[in-house]
Each structure stands twice: as C-alpha cells, then as structure tokens.
Amino acid sequence: MIEKREEQKAELKENGELDFAYSIAGFHRVRFNVFRQRGTYAVALRILSFEIPEAKRLGIPPSVVDLTNRKRGLVLVTGPTGSGKSTTLASLIHIISETYAKTIITLEDPIEYLHPHSKSIVLQREIGYDSKSYASALRAALREDPDVILVGEMRDLETISIAITAAETGHLVFSTLHTNSAAATIDRVIDVFPPHQQQQTRIQLSGVIEGIIAQQLLPKEGGGRVAAYEVMLATPAIRNLIREGKSFQIQSMIQTSKKLGMQAMDDAIYDLYICLLYTSPSPRD
C-alpha cells in the first residue's frame, strides 16, 4: 500500500490530477478524483457501496441480463460520464460469477466494485498499478485463460482492436464507450481505425457484437435518479447493417424490434414517466 501511495503521489505531481478508489472499513468504498486548482488541491468524491446492486434493482432489462449467458462476443455499455456504466457492468459480471464456473478478469481504472469469488474466480487488475495500460493488460489477459474479460474503457485504437480480437477468439468481452446511442457507438468504433481498415473492421465488429446498451440517469420521483436504457441486440438484420456501413438505419431497426428485446431510448424514458419514476412532464424532449 505504501508503494502504491508513492506512485500515486508521483502521478498527481506530474499530471495535476489523480483518480483512485479506496475502501473504508465499516463504511463504504470511495472513488476519489484529486486535482490541482489555483495552486492548491481539490477533491471530488463518489460513494460506492460494497454491495453490488442487483440487475432488477437497477432496472436493467431482461434482454440485457440475458447477454450474460453468451459464451463469446462483445457487449458494450455506453453513456456520458457518471451515467452508471460501471454499476451496470458490475451487476452483469456479478450475475455471471454467481451463475457459472468461469474465470473472469476485470481491467479497471480504478477498481470500483470488489467482486468476491463465487462459482467463478474473479481477478481484478487496476490500470496504473497492476498494469501500465488497458492495451497491455488486455493483451496479457489473452494469455491468462479467461472466459470473460471486462475492459473498463476502450480508450484508443489498440485497446479496441485487441478487444475485438478477444471476442473473435472465444472470449465474452464487456466494455464501455462515451457514446449516447447504439448507432453512435458503431460509428465511434469504426472511425477510430484508418480508412483502409474500416471495412474489415465493420466485418469483424458485425461478427462479434452481441449487444449495445446506451444509458442515461434521469431525476427520480421523490429524489434520486433512475436509469433509462436503450438496448440494441445483434440480430442478423443488425449485423448486416453494421457490415454494410448503414449504422444510420440502426435506430429505426431498434424501434421496430421491441418484441426481440430491443428498446429505444425515447420509449425507455416514456415508460419510466408512465410508471411515475421520471419527473419530467415532457419525456420525449
């Protein structure tokens, strides 16, 4: 722990900011963001529970929970910073751990939720402490015989490329992006690659993607916040749109595929409003 603190002090001094999590016995786990301002330091705190929230409590749709039964492929949870992506992923990983005897490796910056071993073995690596980067940790994970890999964030071309390869080679990969819809997520992944690689990437992505969940947090009746989820599932029609570069048609496909478990964001928000969970009088604005 002393060694880690010295590394964190050096990082804070060099970069002017530091993001980390710390467990306080008998209280909670806390995520800290320390940053320099006007010659001194400030800190933003986020309280994390030791208990991993259940999917039902979070309002995660059953079709999303069903993605935990996949043996391979890529599942992306997207949304703006602070929209609850890490909590959603923690809940899904917990379901796998409680249901199957698998090896799960999580790569996080920092580690937020602590996963106990259950039927699965859960190995959690922190970027900047246990490994230098997401890309290097993900590359190493492929040699560590996991069944499931959680990548906290796909930040660059190298990480995205390795994540796709991992999904192609028989792993179930979960990760996040800062995009607001399934269509925008597909475009973001493709656009990271050089033009001459984009068509091949479309083909690869269409073959490995299993689902994209875009989420946002909305004010809740009586205080607090509630999550709304857009859900895209990789049907043959969706895979074909990705392969042909027609991501602009994905939204309409989601809207017409509700019976298959898909859900448009507008519909999710409207349903929350009808259930009196969302306070806005104009949920479709």
Q: Positions of the model-derived regions?
A:
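Short, flexible helix-loop junctions that flank or precede catalytic/ligand sites
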Residues: M1-S280, R284
